[in-house]
Amino acid sequence: MITALMFAALAFAGENDKSHTPKSFEVSGKKAVFADFSEATYYINYDLSQKIASVKAEIILETTEAGFPVFDSVVAPTSVLFDGASVTTIEAKTPKGETTLRLVNKQAEAGLHTLTVIVPLTALIEFSDAGVKSAFWTSDLDERNFLERYMPANFEFDQVKMNFVVKFLGAKNKQVIYTNGNIAELDSNTFKISYPSYYTSSSIFFHTVPQGATSEERFTLKSIDGRDIPAVVYFSKSSWMGSLANLKTKTTAIFHELESDYGPFPHPSITVLQAGSGGMEYCGATMTDFSALGHELFHSYFARGVMPANGNAGWVDEALASWRDDGYQTISTLSGSSAMSSHEYYTRTTDTAAYSFGKRFMGYLDSKLQSKGGLKPFMRYMVDKKVFTPFYVEEFIKEMSTFTGISVESDFKKYTYGSGNIFARDLKSNPAIHRKMTVKEMQNYL
């Protein structure tokens, strides 16, 4: 069943990307236009003798209107080619300043184009005599902190067929790669990783370390649809002393809980790194502390299964995950409001009210939908129908109203499109599950 859903999602991805493409806007007399990336190949080179790293991105994209194509890279490119010609880029803010992005500094007609960008890789990387530690860990709480933090990428609405070609130049020891893609070893120091076409800039888990730097256990989990799903749980020997047996046991229990509630696990593998305080989710993978493991694996269904298309939809999965963490409690009344659904148009971050007020809002919806079995039947329906399909909040509302036969539009407008500063003080969010870690903290978990 999951295989059929995956193919259906892939067939729909191109049109879905176009329907969720952000609107163009003017900046300094130039029309910034968003593109649909169809494929991106990233050549990631780690030069261990020079202790430097770089990424060369080769991207095929399509624009539907003339203008200056948008992409993003936090790190300034050292070289950019657009349709084979050397160009520069412009770093610019959206009209109301909610986010920053890059433009190709060349007017382009609507249609297919190629974009080649080279950037140095400097974030979350550590060289030593043993090899290199490097990770592309992300956050939905900080601005420009998905894949664009490390290499050129698109906004989260876009599903892209991505490939990594990873080279360890001058490596004396074997490198281990933990990732949620398919790895092929081209030679002793070169690997090609292929990721599914439904992945977005928030989907990829990538972590490489010298062999022997981690403790790990590999095993398989039997899905209710008959698949044997490969799983690995691990932690760094230098930063964490935990129990692989306990980590495996808890991963297994949560896996079966989630399959019982929401159907077959949507992804082909599971990767769990026990590290940090709180956690972050990826498609079938997580970097998490032990206590947040259930929250993060839930996100393989909602966030990295049923996917938000923008920041204003990002609160939904966090509210649902937090509602699960709290035992799916039902409440009949709700005080206050929030602005979780109504931030500025180009917002990319998640409103942290999701962890508190959003959780309570889901409990309120569960009460309202009791005649239809509550909220969970709708959640399973969304996994069945919308897996790997980015959505806007408005689409989520429509799906809920259609499935249940109960209009919830007025409830969302009242409780998630408000001023954002009038919900109860004791519900002000402190997202311990996704606590913001500093770069130094994350560096410690490499």
Question: Predicted regions: what is each one?
Answer:
Residues 216-313:
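Juxtacatalytic substrate-recognition/specificity segment
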Residues 6, 12-53, 429-437:
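N-terminal, polar/Ser/Thr-rich
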Residues 354, 359-434:
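Amphipathic alpha-helical substructures
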Residues 20-22, 66-88, 159-176:
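Solvent-exposed beta-hairpin/edge-strand motifs
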Residues 57, 69, 106, 155, ...:
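Zn2+-dependent metallopeptidase catalytic core
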Residues 152, 283-292, 312-348:
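Post-HExxH zinc-binding segment in Zn-dependent metallohydrolases
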Residues 50, 58-62, 107, 116-211:
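Extended, low-hydrophobicity, Ser/Thr/Pro/Gly-biased non-transmembrane segments
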Residues 74-136, 190:
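A surface-exposed beta-strand-loop module
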